[in-house]
A protein has these predicted regions:
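Noncatalytic, basic helical substrate-engagement surface that gates or grips nucleic-acid strands
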Residues: 2-5, 12-13, 26-204, 210-214, ...
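N-terminal donor/sugar-recognition subdomains of glycan-related enzymes
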Residues: 10-11, 18
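Beta-strand elements of modular eukaryotic interaction domains
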Residues: 21, 61-62, 229, 284
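Intrinsically disordered, low-complexity regions enriched in proline, serine, glycine
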Residues: 42, 83-84, 233-234, 285, ...
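Short amphipathic alpha-helical interaction elements and helix-loop-helix interfaces
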Residues: 67, 195, 199, 217-220, ...
Length: 390
């Protein structure tokens, strides 16, 4: 999701531009949250058979509200036609993931019945190998010798209880990745936000594009999203990581990126996104241009139009995609909501495992911090109408 290889590029080459601060940095200002990326994260973690994903989202909102941040949640509208290929790839990936989970589940059931085949056993062992190699790479530490997968296919006649549990966990994780929220789930989320007094908006098109446009127009100070397309959408500040436990965030300032890359204007960030590959043109990777090369080319040639010897300019679709990164919307109506306990109780009746205590904290802090903000603004305000957008 987003610009290919860019997060790693920034962290490795320009790590000093990944700022780590407390979320209270944005106290008394408005931030827009691209909900889609967080929904995907929570559903993959918890699935959607319970309300744990919903409780996690309420906890995320609480992190902002209790620190005095005015949060507005943005829901996706209609995706542009240019994103059809990317959406198809996601559907295909979910289908392959489901097939993989089903095959593993069948092999585990065969093991428990004593009918497992050699092929099924090898498949399970390989899954263990791959998962351990992945964990080792993430943790940067050596595996315990007993976990070594070298020669496992021939030397492991059976699977230990611990390995079986590990495999079951892998299957559950894969199954969660295949799940998707229903229309009722989305309605329940909107009802929770409304009940707790958290403002939400339906984007005309994509949430991240609309959120970035709102920030560029001065309606807020930052976009909160996991989608690196926000860099090409040129929001002033993009918060990519939020730790709900500590309130710590990691963000980038797009002007600082421009300065570090020695680019002349923010429009070059659009061409940067097109060159490395974004959600609108996944086929652009045929040119095999990574972030390092993209920065060098734009620094030298200023624009895609001036770059010589590109392997296949047609796959870039740069003229069309530039327009998608420069959307125009009508002036928004951002409505401040008042908490509604009746709506919360109605939702609780449908979802018995909804964390009512967490929702209550969200309402309490929303009311308290909003009152403090209003009093503070009334006492010190000398700003004009444009500044009141915040």
């Amino acid at each position: 999701m987003g610009l290919l290889a860019v997060p790693k590029f920034i962290k490795e080459k320009y790590g000093h531009l990944y700022h780590t601060e407390h979320i209270s940095l944005f106290a008394h200002t408005r931030v827009f949250v691209d909900i889609a990326s967080y929904l995907y994260k929570y559903v993959c973690t918890f699935g959607c058979t319970s309300s744990r994903w919903l409780n996690s989202f309420a906890n995320l909102m609480l992190t902002f509200v209790k620190n005095g941040v005015i949060v507005v949640v943005i829901f996706d509208g209609q995706a542009p036609d240019a994103k059809a290929d990317e959406q198809r790839e996601r559907r295909e990936l979910r289908s392959k993931t489901k097939e993989r989970a089903d095959v593993m589940q069948e092999a585990l059931e065969a093991f428990e019945l004593g009918t497992i085949t050699t092929e099924q056993r090898q498949l399970l062992v390989k899954e263990l190998q791959d998962r351990r190699a992945y964990n080792q790479q993430r943790q940067g530490s050596l595996l315990h010798p007993s976990s070594s997968s070298e020669g496992s296919e021939t030397t492991t006649p059976t699977l230990t209880p611990g390995e079986l549990q590990e495999l079951r966990d892998i299957v559950r994780s894969l199954q969660k990745q295949c799940t998707s929220l229903s229309k009722q789930d989305m309605l329940d989320l909107k009802q929770l936000l409304t009940a707790c007094g958290v403002t939400w908006m339906q984007a005309p098109e994509e949430a991240e594009a609309y959120a970035c446009w709102l920030v560029r127009q001065g309606y807020g100070s930052a976009v909160v999203s996991c989608d690196t397309d926000c860099i090409a959408h040129r929001a002033d500040i993009v918060v990519f990581e939020v730790d709900s436990r500590t309130g710590m965030i990691r963000y980038v300032n797009t002007q600082e990126l421009l300065d570090a890359w020695e680019l002349d204007d923010e429009e070059q960030l659009i061409d940067f996104g097109i060159l490395v590959g974004c959600d609108y043109n996944p086929g652009s990777r045929v040119n095999k241009i990574g972030p390092v090369s993209a920065v060098k080319l734009l620094k030298q040639y200023k624009s895609i139009d001036n770059i010589p010897n590109l392997k296949d300019v047609s796959v870039l679709q740069h003229e069309k995609i530039r327009l998608l990164f420069n959307p125009q919307y009508e002036e928004p109506h951002i409505e401040a909501l008042v908490p509604n306990l009746e709506l919360l109780q109605e939702l609780k009746q449908r979802r018995e495992d909804l964390d009512e205590r967490l929702a209550g904290q969200l309402i309490y802090h929303r009311n308290t911090k909003r009152l403090i903000s209003v009093v503070s603004t009334a006492a010190t305000s000398t700003s004009d109408d444009d500044e009141q957008k915040f």
